[in-house]
Design a protein with these regions (language model features):
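Glycine- and other small-residue-rich loops at beta-strand/loop junctions that grip anionic moieties
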Residues: 81, 115, 192, 216, ...
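Residue-level signal for inorganic ion chemistry
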Residues: 34, 96, 126, 203, ...
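RNA substrate-binding interface of SAM-dependent RNA methyltransferases
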Residues: 68-160
Length: 257
């Protein structure tokens, strides 16, 4: 059963889908009155609905059954530097949503490159990823903020992934398999070129746990997937399988440079 998005979904009653979603239901999927579809509101409410009417290419549906889902625990908060290349940034947001990230905080670091902020487009990306992955919740997206502000406001267990080997002399990085996936966690990924050494030191001094994603140097969006996949199944074997599946399915859509 296909999943569609309707932000104002209620647990019962009838409603009319947006013009865009109606077009997908009627003209793309060619549903007819009497067909059943699934509707999500991005806040945990999921409803099985019956298509009751099609008028002027707008679809009216009636809720047959609904259930309110709580956000799955543990929650993962992603703090990541925005990317200069818009398509790579949007790809990152899409895959983070598919992997079930709870919150995304764009943090502005010393090496963050110029970026553009397109919130309405990001909302559409989140909705599409939610429907595709059959998830029930949209991630929270914060406005971009300086790293110092994020550091002052964050109180979760934080892992900062970096590749500065010189910092290991003071506080060695732990490997992915040593991450604690049993509680709410924040994962920090820096910009292209990594965090500045002084930023790493401030984060570690403030309680962040330095993390290694392996011997290879990864682009920001790849590092995000590698880190988030650790939380998907709670074990490296399941996380690795999930990461492999995601990378294979995304290969044709990932922007290449």
């Amino acid at each position: 059963m296909e999943t569609y998005f309707f932000a104002d979904l209620c647990p019962e009653g009838s409603f009319e889908l947006s013009e865009e979603e109606s077009k997908h239901v009627v003209k793309v999927r060619r549903h007819q009155p009497g067909d059943r579809v699934r509707i999500a509101n991005g806040l945990g409410l999921l409803a099985d609905c019956e298509l009751t009417e099609i008028r002027s290419s707008r679809a009216t549906l009636r809720v047959l059954h609904s259930i309110q889902h709580a956000w799955p625990e543990p929650r993962i908060h992603l703090a990541v530097s925005p990317l200069h290349h818009e398509d790579r940034w949007e790809w990152l947001l899409e895959k983070a949503t598919e992997l079930g990230v709870y919150r995304i905080s764009p943090v502005l670091c010393e090496r963050t490159e110029h970026y553009r902020w397109k919130l309405p487009r990001y909302s559409r990306i989140f909705e599409s990823a939610l429907k595709h992955s059959l998830r029930t919740h949209l991630p929270i997206l914060d406005q971009p903020m300086p790293l110092s502000q994020f550091q002052a406001e964050s109180n979760a267990v934080t892992y900062v992934a970096h590749c500065d080997e010189s910092a290991d002399a003071r506080t060695p990085r732990i490997s992915l398999d040593l991450m604690d996936c049993s509680r709410n966690t924040c994962l920090m990924i820096g910009p292209e070129g990594d965090f500045h050494p002084s930023e790493i030191q401030r984060l570690v001094d403030n309680g962040a746990i330095p993390l290694s994603l392996g011997a290879l140097r990864l682009r920001t969006e790849t590092a995000v997937i590698a880190g988030l996949s650790r939380f998907l199944g709670g074990s490296m074997q399941r996380a690795g399988a999930a990461l492999l599946t995601l990378l294979l399915t995304a290969l044709l859509t990932m922007p290449m440079y």
